[in-house]
């Protein structure tokens, strides 16, 4: 079983790849759309019992969640 640090490093790699490819998210609606798309891909991977795809899609879901926070969260959360 992977360690938390290894998983987070994989999430960071995916986050950086997606940001380099698509740029920052511009709205919460865009963020939701991207996150839902990745979730649907995760659901498909689970329903086909493709564990390699489940892992890849779960990492993408985590990375897109992080992108929403990084790209759209207010600079001063208070």
List each model region and its residues.
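Flexible "arm" and connector segments at domain edges
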Residues: 1-78
